[in-house]
């Protein structure tokens, strides 16, 4: 079954590379049953006054629909301007009872009481992706039939080992 991860992170006042590179790397590193939801996928310049409200509503709907939120708050960008949108997305995830995984190389993020208690915290994207792959990855079958072993099958195996003694 496919699982989805919403990729929350800075967009406003960021370069194209700062917006896209980490999202592309994470998407490529997820297991094949994990799909990334990129909030930047449908952004465009518009003079329409409601654009910011539309973006916020789209992002909220994406956080509702996803299975997990991965939030990236790098120190270099936080020092220029905190990503208020990303903090909103973390709060949405928390209130929607979604697992939230936060990645930051900024000790202020790791020590902030609201962020510290809202999800799993990591210093690197690699560690976070590994954690997500474990949480959302599909179990591999180990039986000859191609199906996972039946519940309790391990107990029977253990009992047979004990009876040989």
Name each model feature, range by range:
Residues 5, 147-150:
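Short, intrinsically disordered, low-complexity terminal segments
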Residues 141-145, 157:
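Short, positively charged low-complexity motifs
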Residues 1-140:
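Conserved catalytic or regulatory cores that recognize and/or transform ribose-phosphate-containing ligands
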């Amino acid at each position: 079954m496919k699982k989805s991860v919403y990729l929350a992170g800075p967009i406003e006042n960021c370069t194209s590379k700062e917006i896209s590179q980490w999202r592309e790397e994470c998407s490529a590193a997820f297991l094949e049953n994990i799909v990334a939801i990129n909030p930047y996928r449908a952004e465009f310049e518009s003079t329409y006054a409601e654009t910011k409200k539309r973006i916020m509503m789209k992002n909220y709907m994406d956080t509702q629909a996803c299975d997990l939120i991965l939030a990236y708050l790098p120190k270099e960008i936080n020092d220029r301007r905190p990503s208020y949108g990303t903090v909103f997305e973390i709060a949405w995830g928390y209130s929607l009872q979604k697992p939230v995984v936060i990645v930051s190389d900024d000790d202020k993020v790791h020590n902030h009481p609201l962020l510290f208690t809202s999800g799993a915290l990591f210093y690197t994207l690699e560690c976070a992706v590994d954690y997500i792959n474990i949480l959302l990855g599909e179990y591999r079958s180990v039986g000859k039939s191609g199906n996972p072993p039946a519940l309790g099958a391990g107990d029977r195996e253990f009992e047979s080992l004990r009876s040989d003694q």
